[in-house]
């Protein structure tokens, strides 16, 4: 039950957000805004998500995830409705940035992984996290064509309202993820939240993980938000890649192959050193982006790139969270996963915002693509020395 409804929760939350890039041009064109405006809203959404995630995680660890997820589902629906009816930048940013950013802290991986960590045996934990991540990937694959269909049939405003109704399904889903009190009474002595935080931030491997996770956020959010307009811009020279169908198919392929990638990373993470798998993922991304820029653009090259990136897309999540659980145990897993996730969201903010900012000033995304490549090599290096051993305090967790 936990795997099924936890997977459904991230299917809805991650699936809806994965399609936001499709709304970039329709919304900015209709309102006469620059791409920087939409990019800033999504960037703030990711930053708020990351900044508040440790707090939401601590509340979920302390009081139970169910209440947190119900509130998150309500905020998600309100945020989408607010995006639909907003006609000025401030209201749009509050709805899409603040409300949905807060909602995602309560409905995505960190909270669900906390539930799994407390209720799944340690020898199956990373596998279960891979299953949950694969469910989120399925949501991305499912929702991209659905959101494009809503856009084409009803326009951006009505499409967002319908997505808001869909987001409200997260509230009854949360009801099925209620935990018994026994799940929170884990044997970790009398360690407090403050002590757990101090223990984590002083751990070199935890710091290296957070650096690598910054890169993950930068790359995936830049591509999710700016791939569609990037392909549209290429249409003047390469008309075949500018069709909305190409961008929709590419984003759907990312979601499809992400299913296999996240499941595979969870499976392999039970059998091989997770740090080496993480390093390989980041290096693979750098190579894939480099090849995408060097090969003449075409629908086929775009689909191949999307498939490779999809396989590597969120495969970092079960591995990173698995290492955190392995080192520190599961009592404060939601909070500590949220803390390392904050670094991911700082990267997301930079990827989303820099994409729009530098495009509006240079007329090109090339510089941001090059940054994404360099960061991939950096993350490959910093994950290699991570130590996966449990610290003495939580050796039996």
List PLM regions with ranges.
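Hydrophobic core of transmembrane alpha-helices in multi-pass small-molecule transporters
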Residues: 11, 91-107, 214, 301-315
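Residue-level signature of mid-helix packing/kink "hotspots" within the transmembrane helices
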Residues: 18, 46-54, 141, 255-263, ...
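Extracytoplasmic gate region of multi-pass secondary transporters
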Residues: 20-24, 203-265
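Conserved MFS/SLC helix-loop-helix module at the cytosolic interface between two early adjacent transmembrane helices
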Residues: 51-90, 269
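Cytoplasmic helix-loop-helix junction between adjacent transmembrane helices
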Residues: 96-134, 329
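Helix-loop-helix hairpin linking two adjacent transmembrane segments in secondary transporters
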Residues: 132-179
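Flexible cytoplasmic inter-helical loops of multi-pass small-molecule transporters
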Residues: 176-195, 392-397
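C-terminal transmembrane helical hairpin of 12-TM major facilitator-type secondary transporters
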Residues: 246, 252-258, 263-323
